[in-house]
């Protein structure tokens, strides 16, 4: 019986992962945003932020997701960035 639970949990987890991936694909499609475009945005963000701080580019995570608008709860695309900062640069302030 424990073996059955193990496999059913695995398929449930795989199902959830597949569901989340499908949601992400749909968000990208509805926002009319290709992976190449997202990479261009990521490169531009790195260039701008690097003027002000040293960042961990390997830990950088930029993705397109969806969120709800406050005034009408409509689902809209959102650009979410997690940018690990190594240190702030001295800009002569």
UniProtKB/Swiss-Prot annotation:
GO terms under biological process: cell division; regulation of division septum assembly
InterPro entries from the UniProt entry: MinE, MinE_sf
Assigned keywords, A-Z: Cell cycle, Cell division
Family matches, as NCBIfam families: minE (TIGR01215)
Similarity section: Belongs to the MinE family.
Function: Prevents the cell division inhibition by proteins MinC and MinD at internal division sites while permitting inhibition at polar sites. This ensures cell division at the proper site by restricting the formation of a division septum at the midpoint of the long axis of the cell.
Protein's name according to its UniProt entry: Cell division topological specificity factor
Organism: Alkaliphilus oremlandii (strain OhILAs)
Higher taxonomy: Bacteria, Bacillati, Bacillota, Clostridia, Peptostreptococcales
